[in-house]
Amino acid sequence: MAVNLYDYANQLEQALRDSDEYKAIKDAFAKVKENEESKKLFDEFRETQMSFQQKQMQGEEIPEEDLQKAQEQAQAIEKDENISELMNAEQKMSQVFQEINQIIVKPLDEIYAD
């Protein structure tokens, strides 16, 4: 019987949805959305990040004034408890993803280790 990796991937997706880390992100994001100021700061910061990524992908330089604006936004975000909670939750989930990725690529690592 052949192993269907996609079935395992779907099980992993469900396990991630059931995890405490996922629930923490979901709860923290709900708090951000409920608070008008937090939501505005969060949306502006994400918009700035996407703009930077787009410019970098196109090989454009990011103007100094845009960098300054992003730094000011980052400082405001650090002071916002709701967004800080969300960022901490995202960081924990990112750690989980890194650990899962190490497990997933382990068979390939073993092949190339010799």
Curated annotation (Swiss-Prot):
Xref: HAMAP family: UPF0342
Taxonomy, superkingdom: Bacteria
Family: Belongs to the UPF0342 family.
Coiled-coil intervals, chain numbering: none
Protein name, as recorded: UPF0342 protein SERP1381
Taxonomic lineage from the root: Bacteria, Bacillati, Bacillota, Bacilli, Bacillales
